[in-house]
Amino acid sequence: MSVSGLPFDDFRTLLRDLPGPDARALVTARERDAQLTKPPGALGRLEEIAFWLAAWTGRTPAVNRPLVAIFAGNHGVTRQGITPFPPAVTQQMVENFAAGGAAINQICVAYDLGLKVFDLALDYPTGDITEEAALSERDCAATMAFGMEAIAGGTDLLCIGEMGIGNTTIAAAINYALYGGSARDWVGPGTGSEGEMLERKIAAVEKAVELHGDHLDDPLEIMRRLGGREIAAMAGAILAARMERIPVLIDGYVATAAAAILKAANPSALDHCLIGHVSAEPGHLRAIEMLGKTPLLALGMRLGEGTGAALAAGIVKAAAACHSGMATFAQAGVTNKD
């Protein structure tokens, strides 16, 4: 990143100058779809997914190197008693990912997806957002830059996920800051907060947004003050994918909050993204609607780990396979409609 100016300056420049889709590839995909052995529109959203792939990759729809990227971070706000699990669980789950024992590992095997896990200074939780900013601008920008490395090994479909005890509190605070309403609108149980603990979680979100209220007109400031390292890294990964025209599948409530930061900075910033699923976390559907998106799946999941995005990758792979592998009417000797 630049050694001059403020730490966020380079990201602001990138967000102003985002590349768009390949219009010619989109036209070509639509023309081929019209000749495939099916009635127009019969494959529903699979057709739109194929067009989306073509437009962003600039070629015939294909998924050859899908990747799930999980970003793990810890949060100082857990000191407020807002979650039943201790922060140590974040590191333990990272180790579980490495050992192949988590749900995401099984889904990646089932759908032939690559998996990378990014450990984001787990021994150094972010600042407690009810008392101070989560990150300095320099640390936040550096973490965004680190997240951009998610695509370094090459991928043509990036699935964005996370792991972090306390991060549904962070996501709720971001959504509350971006969209308003009340803290209660955005706070859900997460990993199992209920009763008095849930009330503490709501109070923490209210206190954090009030504390930082004078600085919340800038999306990047919202991210550094109310977010976390996995939020910043996911935002960086989504932005890096856009610069390389790599399609992205966004996972659950927390990943959607990271994406919302980019959308607030540039309304077109998520055009290369689809939402993999709507989770059972109460605020997620509303957050998705605020982004103008429609999730691919609704399975009642609320695990995180990129699991919903990974499952949606199977649908995207199927959409590409149908578009590329189906015969045309002429090839199959099937009579087309008049």
Swiss-Prot record:
Catalyzes the synthesis of alpha-ribazole-5'-phosphate from nicotinate mononucleotide (NAMN) and 5,6-dimethylbenzimidazole (DMB). It is an enzyme of class 2 (transferase). The gene is cobT. Signal peptide: none annotated. HAMAP family: CobT. Belongs to the CobT family. This is Nicotinate-nucleotide--dimethylbenzimidazole phosphoribosyltransferase. The active site is at E305.
